[in-house]
Amino acid sequence: MNTTINVNLAGQHYYFDQAAKVKLEIYFEEIKSYFTDESFLQELMTDVEARIAELLNDIRLDSNQVITIQHIENVIQIMCEPNSFKIYEEKTQS
């Protein structure tokens, strides 16, 4: 059984199993690796966290439901892979 971890995401409280938390942290780090502009990155990460929180609220049946790695994989599929963020940055900067 995975350990359950309390996670605060975009000002909202969630219970994550350990594998889900690690998967989400890796996703965030991959996004961050594509950007050098700190102010843009900070704004982007705030928006990404808020959107992920919205998606998780749609997924969970109640506030005590544990978020699993499958939930995070579904969210990432909706959000898109991190390399898509780099393509967006290149288009907006040219």
Question: Predicted regions: what is each one?
Answer:
Residues 1-94:
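Soluble N-terminal domains of membrane-associated systems
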